[in-house]
Amino acid sequence: MKNLRLFALLAFLLLAGKNTMAQTDLEALMATRGEYFFSLPLQQREEAKRLTRLCSVDKLEGNRLICYANEEQYRQLLAMGYQPMLLMPPSMQEHYAMWDGTNREAYDWDAYPTYEAYQDMMKHYAEDFPERCTYFDLGTLASGRKLMFCRFNNGDPDGKPKFLYTSTIHGDELTGMMLMLRLIDELCTSNDPRILALLDQLDIFISPCTNPNGTYHGGNNTVYGARRNNANDADLNRNYPDFDNGPHPDGKEYQPETIMMMELAEQYPFTMAANYHGGSEVLNYPWDTYQPLHPDDEWWQLVCHEYADLTHEHDTMYMSGFDNGIVNGYVWYPIYGSRQDYMNYYQQCREVTIECSIPYTPNPSTMPMYWTYNHESMLRYLEQCLYGIHGRVTDSVTGAPLEAEVTILTHDHHGSAVSSHLPAGDYHRPIKGGTYEVTYSCEGYYPKTLTLTVADWETLVQDVQLVPEGYGVEEGGPSAPLTGLVIYLNPTNGVLFVEAQNFASLQNQTYRITNLMGQTLLTGNITAETQQINVSSLPQGMYFITIAGETRKFVVR
């Protein structure tokens, strides 16, 4: 396997050399494509920040940037005095074996599917395995091509974490597309208990190609000539709202593909996601746009190292750069408008960018090798969606599920808090092992804060009931005085305080706490001007306290 990888890299380098052309010829070629691929020397890191606003910086290699630009961007760079070194487009360095969809049983994942074969595969999986898989698309582009998905669960997705795997937002980065198709095949056909457990416990969405116009730019029967950008010359991974650089950081309107994906994220509250790219071998975790660390930076390093470390069991040189296969996006090079940052900040979804091959458009004969490298890591990343703190939030009176905010105190910010969602009221919070103060809050309900401890690779189920505001409390609020008697905190989660304006009249009086059935649960005497009564032994619910003939209602939460 290592020899095969070495062969693939050598072939990539040789083909790049073989296809070297004069700069004038390359410029003419790229003008016909409307997309330029080039390198720029980098003198200072600050220059990368400036250039990422002028073109699509794809990666930083030593002291040079590898970039893409559309016609307008390229002319602007030239006008500003930059001298790009044009490079052969990745998808034009060789001709690629294509599969037209015939003889599916003999297909060995070593040729790229034509568009029609890709579409047929997606639909046939759902038709052949309806108990596991459903097919849907997000809509039809002007070209007639679709953004297609397969969705996997056991037929009962409510209350389960939702997971999103996608690839090829850049049309010429095809390794991830093939990994996604093969994972779809495994989820449909395998009866391994591990796969069945994933189908039972998760609601999984997979889209192998989210930029089909870029991938099949040269026509539906080939990926030769595939482009990074979409049909409107837009880099889709710079086209999302950016919390630090505004709603349109690329200066373009939201593209049809972007709108479709944002609508999907609004409809389905994904817990975790990954988006596969090519051109490097590294897991790029948040943020891309922002230097301060993500609140869950330690968790991100944990799960990213797990992914990369598992690939090293097959080849220690694969995903070995940076911090042993992982990198903070901003530390590598900043970009603005990435889907990763959009999903993390705006959609409360932990999404990572996985760069899975140095060649952008590898020879498809190497695809089985990349599957071997990534297979276990892909399953482990899916399973990470099951760890952390999970549960349901419901109304303490009616039992109805609630849409509540679940916030880790002194920890969450920049969109890292999660929510519970209807119809089940379920929430899912992946987090690094530790002890946390977790607050559950919902409009119209008293908040509740719990101290929870969870370990790495552990699942903690914590269901929570919230008490409606004003439930069982007299008009005027829970601490409104009546003939000088005041009780607080109300609701309480442990200690009830009783005060009287005229302590002498209450001193040594007996208090009695009863439930809704009238049963006496606690009694005692008033012995202090501010009497503390321990009610931590009482279950959640509404109670009455009676002192000297006066009765107050209170709630234990």
Predicted regions and their residues:
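Bacterial Sec-dependent N-terminal signal peptides
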Residues: M1-L29
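C-terminal outer-membrane/trafficking sorting elements
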Residues: K18-A22, G477-R557
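Active-site/substrate-binding loop(s) of hydrolase catalytic cores
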Residues: A142, P157-H305, E313, M317-S320, ...
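Active-site-adjacent mobile loop/cap segments within catalytic or ligand-binding domains
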Residues: M272-P295, G325-E383
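A short, amphipathic beta-strand motif
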Residues: I389-S396, V464
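Short, acidic Ser/Thr/Gly-rich low-complexity loop/linker segments typical of extracellular
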Residues: A400-K432
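A short, solvent-exposed beta-strand micro-motif common in secreted/extracellular proteins
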Residues: G433-G444
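Structured interaction patches on ligand/partner-binding surfaces of diverse proteins
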Residues: E443-E469, V556-R557
